[in-house]
Amino acid sequence: MQGFISQVLGPVVDVDFNDYLPQINEAIVVNFESEGKKHKLVLEVAAHLGDNRVRTIAMDMTDGLVRGLKAEALGAPISVPVGEKVLGRIFNVTGDLIDEGEEIPFDKKWAIHRDPPAFEDQSTKSEIFETGIKVVDLLAPYAKGGKVGLFGGAGVGKTVIIMELIHNVAFKHSGYSVFAGVGERTREGNDLYNEMKESNVLDKVALCYGQMNEPPGARNRIALTGLTMAEYFRDEMGLDVLMFIDNIFRFSQSGSEMSALLGRIPSAVGYQPTLASEMGKFQERITSTKKGSITSVQAVYVPADDLTDPAPATVFAHLDATTVLNRAIAEKGIYPAVDPLDSTSRMLDPNIIGEEHYKVARGVQSVLQKYKDLQDIIAILGMDELSEEDKLVVERARKIEKFLSQPFFVAEVFTGSPGKYINLEDTIAGFKGILEGKYDHLPENAFYMVGNIDEAIAKAETLREISRGDTCLDNCKVEQKKAN
């Protein structure tokens, strides 16, 4: 099944065959030499041009490629390694190792183009995916097998939340994670790898990188490479897998570039006419089955903060929850800096999460919203001008704000505080107590960076003892001065 290259137009390569026509999405391999080095280039069939000629998209740079070079059709789509051997390693779009580790043979490989699970195999139960992070589980819970949009600028803690989720899935759910860097900066990918190494979560995650400098084919298909690895863990091993995609916008962007290179007429704002169907095909594979689930957290870049842009707007249609990180909250020193009022979830429904959880979550949001509304009055007139009822709202809101923070396992290295995983029942009980006024007598500092409410009570006692000790010390100094 050999052919030869008839045309090279950047990342688009035309290949002619004599008596064979490769199918759409079939892989074609070209082995060639350039500047004294041997190269292996993988192409993917994108269109049939007639007369046994196919138009392909290259998965790597086409520098050094010339007309007339032999090309071999593999008779199948790009296949990538799957199974436990992929954990702790970095792969490119074609499933080759790109880290500094030793080369190992992979006995299992799956094609990256797959159908979503059959309807009868899918699980229709609405279940919460417990993360152990208070603010997420209480106010914007994730659906098992659902899709979460992670919104946040640089430096507000996206990577730390991603690593904490990977840690909690590994150690509390005995599950694995897959990270797909779609159009990532090489430096960011490198930083993430090193941080995971330091945080001891690397052996529970497979990393797939299609970096920013790579052709659009690689940046687009890397999402499918990562998803295929996650599907194996779900379908063959029956696990609940967490899949991270950073950034899902780059998936649409690279698809738009590929579409333009293939000569298709663009749609709105220059995007590919098949944007919605491509996104739908990809997102439909991320689901729960009766065996296991893939829950995905997708970082979403919004170009020029325009939520009506077709790329983010297409993603929103598929999301079950949004986790919004807020710089103003991070500046207060409250981590994770998740915005409790902006973050949403379709799971926040009394029929799914139960009446008690729903009432507590809405109560917390109501108190925080009232506090937000009162902030202008406090800034101009001060706390003394508020009614007694409003003062109580402010006090409880500040305690809630502090209690929404928690120490992370992966941040132990630089905070010195041991990480905490908080069960949903403990989270609900703690916030319910604050709303009911059970802990009005405790200082607000007692609620900062603790796990459950018992730890807040213990911290309040410790603060009281420190305060008593300081008072005693001051009294001793006064007595000493009098004696002198």
From Swiss-Prot:
GO terms for molecular function: ATP binding; ATP hydrolysis activity; proton-transporting ATP synthase activity, rotational mechanism. It is an enzyme of class 7 (translocase). It is found in: Cell inner membrane. InterPro entries: AAA+_ATPase, ATP-synt_VA_C, ATP_synth_F1_bsu, ATPase_a/bsu_AS, ATPase_alpha/beta_chains, ATPase_F1/V1/A1_a/bsu_N, ATPase_F1/V1/A1_a/bsu_N_sf, ATPase_F1/V1/A1_a/bsu_nucl-bd. Keywords: ATP synthesis, ATP-binding, Cell inner membrane, Cell membrane, CF(1), Hydrogen ion transport, Ion transport, Membrane, Nucleotide-binding, Translocase, Transport. It is a peripheral membrane protein. Its EC number is 7.1.2.2. It catalyses: ATP + H2O + 4 H(+)(in) = ADP + phosphate + 5 H(+)(out). One of its GO terms (cellular component) is proton-transporting ATP synthase complex. Pfam families: ATP-synt_ab, ATP-synt_ab_N, ATP-synt_VA_C. Produces ATP from ADP in the presence of a proton gradient across the membrane. The catalytic sites are hosted primarily by the beta subunits. This is ATP synthase subunit beta. It comes from Campylobacter jejuni subsp. doylei (strain ATCC BAA-1458 / RM4099 / 269.97).
